[in-house]
Amino acid sequence: MSIMKRESLPEEYIPYIRHVNQHVIALNSRCLMTVMAVEGVNFDTADINHLNSLHNQLNTLLRNIADERVALYSHIIRRRETIYPESRFFSSFAATLDEKYKKKMVSQELYRNDLFVSLLWNPTSGKTEQLASFFQRLTKAKKTQSEPDMEAIRKIEELSQDLIQGLESYEARLLSVYAHEGILFSEQSEFLHQLVGGRRERIPLTFGTIASTIYSDRVIFGKEMIEIRHESNERFVGMFGWKEYPSKTRPGMTDGLLTAPFEFILTQSFVFKSKAAARVIMGRKQNQMINAADRASSQIDALDEALDDLESNRFVLGEHHLSLAVFADQPKTLVEYLSKARAHLTNGGAVIAREDLGLEAAWWAQLPGNFSYRARSGAITSRNFAALSPFHSFPIGKLEGNVWGAAVALLKTQAGSPYYFNFHYGDLGNTFVCGPSGSGKTVIVNFLLAQLQKHNPTMVFFDKDQGAEIFVRAGGGKYKPLKNGQPTGIAPLKGMEYTEKNKIFLRSWVLKLVTTEGQTVTEQERQDIAKAINSLESLPHAQRSLGALQLFFDNTSKEGIAIRLQRWIKGNDLGWVFDNDQDDLNLDSQFIGYDMTDFLDNEEIRRPLMMYLFNRILDLIDGRRIIIVIDEFWKALEDDSFKAFAQDRLKTIRKQNGMMLFATQSPKDALNSTIAHTIIEQCPTQIFFPNQKANYKDYVEDFKLTEREFELIQSELSRESRRFLIKQGQNSVVAELNLRGMNDEIAILSGTTKNIELVNQIINDYGADPDTWLPIFHQRRENQ
């Protein structure tokens, strides 16, 4: 295929003049335009009924904004994504993990789909002027710098807001002017620049026309191929158009393109027709069939029914066109991509044509407002357009501008697109993680926590079975495995300042030690404990022990506080729990881990222990960034102190810049709790792993997953795939974490009993600095 050297000046084909305001652009035809970016809906995890409902809603929206002075363009721009979230870590392990993972991810072919819808309004067309004749003059109109009519600006802004509201389910927003490093840039110009040159870059506001600003690459047209020359590279483009429309349309006819392994621009336009013009078009088509003695009487009957639907306002009619521009770095590669693209486009029954003689017109017809360049257009209904442009896509998350800054982690979706994961959904970061043993839950949770270290939060991890011990220690944290019969290093009477608030807590805590569940406490006992705490304050810090506290009580009563406190004093059967030489909870560390597995079933110890721990953790929730992680939290929920802590903090921790992460093997564990409603409501980010034994009621009726999401979890996703479902609000996506070849890192993220013992041996010999013991650990582990 030869390239013919044929170029044109931008003003001849690009109709955009300038910004009227931050949202509205004026065209040289005096048309006005706004552009919206649309997140879209993930068709891959949505129920069919939901997609059909959205299709009906789109049709209703199109009917509501129908006006012969209005036109819509929709674009899908599929492009390679190479951006990796910015990262700086306070632990060398997290930095090494990120470096290896980044290298793996940026080498992959990840593509994203950017969806846009453009709204055009003709302010000069009177009620008696036919829109068709006006659009024929659009590209012939002379360039004008005259001020647009203020009423027209008001009208397009109103229509834009109506469109934004109607697309609420798709998360649409108006493109606008923005500032970056003190310079004003235009999102609309950046979008249009992609249509003109197929490349994304920042476009500043200038005193010149938008047309001259966005034409920065040379676009050269050949017989069947376009060459786009940039100073650093060149690209080649081939185009398809719809020659004949399919007999029926359905939502998702072009969804196959959304996973294609190449870049493209899919353009569609829809110019609304008046009801009178629609009657003429449909009547003419019906007469053609009758005059031709067409035997397909069913088609004539269908047109009768369609005319009735038109009169009943069940749809509106518009002039539509569709084109697909496919990009490649080499002509040979382009041929391969075009073959794949053709298969996707013909999947719905349409007849498509490769653009050759009309290639240049087809290219410029991608630009909203270039109506006269649409060589292949046809009349379709709003229901057809809603099916052909259903705003299906895959969520990509949010790279920047999150509550804590850049995205926590870049993940790959099942569709091969990037997903920028954040714990936060809006300003709420609480997260619920559910997956059976062996599903990969531990690796992924700890990986995300390692990535979170870029935001420098305080991290408190309540572990079970020491599964995260190696990870906490490798991340520069301090880990305290609390074991039955072994001194805990906890001494509440020595660990707290004797403020009025803390003394009130210590009174309640001592009561916990000397009473059993349901036991009545007398007012005299409360007063005695308060006096004893006040007296203990006068002692030197080192002498504030439970043994010393006992001396302030009457020891003559066989059932008094002194006797009931006896077993908690050093040297007695529970003296190892709280009567220690010093209180060392490691609260000065930025990363703290506790393992309480031994005590979860021991209510007598668990109640006062968790009461104290969570009270001290409360002091850390002071506005600093903090995440509190509780593994197998359902077991902890059996404790009243934790239950109260969780119920209160789930609702309020966001106000103090914190979040909580709850992990469990089964959703039923959470649902059995009396605060299940709070957990579901206050954890907008939910991560579910494959589970062949998943219960429909637990997942769908209680956790409100869609039937499609449940189907994915129960049957379609395998454990071996290392894929999982992320749900935030009403949106969900299937993502994967590929750590193949990163065996050293996996050994840290998911600790085995054997490796935990090895790490503790090495730390005993070489110290707790992970930069020292990690290399030794990897060497010995490989030699085992």
Curated annotation (Swiss-Prot):
Its main location: membrane. The keyword Transport applies. It is found in: Cell inner membrane. Pfam families: CagE_TrbE_VirB, P-loop_TraG. One of its GO terms (molecular function) is ATP hydrolysis activity. The keyword Iron-sulfur does not apply. Coiled coil: none annotated. It comes from the Bacteria. Keywords: ATP-binding, Cell inner membrane, Cell membrane, Membrane, Nucleotide-binding, Transport, Virulence. InterPro entries: AAA+_ATPase, CagE_TrbE_VirB, CagE_TrbE_VirB_cntrl_dom, P-loop_NTPase, P-loop_TraG, T4SS_component. ATP binds at residues 435-442. CDD domains: TrwB_TraG_TraD_VirD4. NCBIfam families: VirB4_CagE. Belongs to the TrbE/VirB4 family. Component of the type IV secretion system VirB/VirD4 which could be a major virulence determinant for subversion of human endothelial cell (HEC) function. Altogether with virB11, may be implicated in providing the energy, via hydrolysis of ATP, for the assembly of secretion system and substrate transport. This is Type IV secretion system protein virB4. It comes from Bartonella quintana (strain Toulouse) (Rochalimaea quintana). The lineage of its organism: Bacteria, Pseudomonadati, Pseudomonadota, Alphaproteobacteria, Hyphomicrobiales. The gene is virB4.
